[in-house]
């Protein structure tokens, strides 16, 4: 189901060549790379252990068109010093697993002249993606896009009350839909704490804008209370990445 709805949201063709750098034992690599390539009969080029230089060599050698990766991999490819490779075959990059700094997105798309980075979001408990941006024209930078087909999202406060749209309406992200797990194996207590009336509690803090795009602020556990203000590590990281002396 997840492979089908993900492929419908971000179209993939049989002539696509996908760089497989994510482990297949993880739900992200299993669903968004292996299963989607099998489902749509496209070519996969395997890289068993990630190395930025090796990944870029494969891009040039095989004419890679699509990459699914985590931000640390994209950072490695951006910072590789060899600028002589032809990377123009890459048209689409899906980033997930953690937040992608905006400065990294800018530098990556400058290095890969035809590439568009699309951020998405998912969990093992949701069998991978529940939301994703779909194109350069429609994406909202810093957002994880909109829910996939059949999936709903709501934002709630600490008491479980529904929050409306707006950057000042930060709460926990909850998802409900056909790809959400039935429960944890032989662990009814954990299941009851995570699934509430069919809604998956993600433990991630975020908000929605007026157009339905979802923004992840940070993990609920990582919120820092300082002088009456909510400080999220991701916001600090964004500022650091923009500083010219930070590599």
Regions found by a protein language model. Name each.
Residues 166-181, 199, 205-206:
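AMP-binding/adenylate-forming core of the ANL superfamily
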Residues 59, 67, 177, 182-186, ...:
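AMP-binding/adenylate-forming catalytic core of the ANL superfamily
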Residues 2-17, 25-66, 80:
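Conserved AMP-binding/adenylation subdomain of ANL enzymes
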Residues 97, 122, 145, 204, ...:
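Active-site glycine-centered loops adjacent to acidic/histidine catalytic or metal-binding residues
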Residues 142-148, 194-197:
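Short Gly/Pro-enriched turn/cap motifs at secondary-structure boundaries
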Residues 14-15, 90, 197:
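Phosphate-coordination loops involved in phosphoryl transfer and adenosine-cofactor binding
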Residues 154-174, 193, 210-211:
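Conserved beta-loop-beta connector loops within the AMP-binding
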Residues 39, 61-69, 78-140, 149-152, ...:
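Gly/Ser/Thr-rich phosphate-binding loop
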